From Swiss-Prot:
Tissue: Female salivary gland.
Gene Ontology CC terms, in alphabetical order: extracellular region
InterPro entries for this protein: PBP_GOBP_sf
Disulfide bonds: 28-61, 41-147, 103-119
GO MF: odorant binding
Keywords annotated in UniProt: Disulfide bond, Secreted, Signal
Coiled coil: none
Residue intervals passing through the bilayer: none
Localization terms from the record: Secreted
UniProt gene name: D7S1
Leader sequence segment: 1-21
Family: Belongs to the PBP/GOBP family.
Protein name per its UniProtKB record: Short form salivary protein D7S1
Length: 148
């Protein structure tokens, strides 16, 4: 009985923490894109690339404030990304490492957070898990009605 109570308390604590987590994507959008709702809509729908004005800087802000990237988005911290995925039921550190290495080879020295985002969302090894985690962890941003 005590064990069940402990697990219930732990579960509700985790749910409470996840619901009240800071949305780094929303904070960066509020700081950098508050006057550009059409671009926020495209980001919300993940219909962006690094050639679009403001997107590279925005994604670097979102990834760096999440703790996922360093050095202007040039280095992805797969350990931190993997750690952030665990509460959502995903344990794919090896796959994150593989996709990140392939991405760095493809984009070279000019890589940025938007490139890492694209790689993680395109590769079969990570796309479903990463997108699910992103939508849940950053729900304050991704659940907004930005497209009207």
């Amino acid at each position: 009985m005590k064990q069940n109570v402990f697990f219930l308390i732990a579960y509700f604590s985790l749910v409470f923490c996840m619901c009240n987590a800071v949305s780094h994507f929303k904070n960066c959008a509020d700081k950098q894109l508050s006057d550009d709702k059409p671009l926020q809509c495209k980001i919300r729908n993940l219909q962006v690339d690094g050639n679009m004005p403001k997107v590279k800087e925005y994604m670097n802000c979102a990834f760096e404030s999440s703790g996922w990237a360093k050095d202007g988005g040039k280095k992805l911290d797969t350990s931190k990304v993997a750690q952030d995925m665990v509460p959502y039921g995903f344990n794919i550190k090896t796959e994150l490492d593989e996709v990140t290495k392939e991405c760095e080879t493809e984009f070279g020295a000019e890589i940025s957070s938007i490139d890492y985002l694209a790689c993680l969302l395109i590769d079969e090894k990570t796309k479903t898990q990463f997108k699910t985690m992103l939508m849940m962890k950053e729900a304050d941003f991704f659940k907004q009605n930005l497209c009207n």
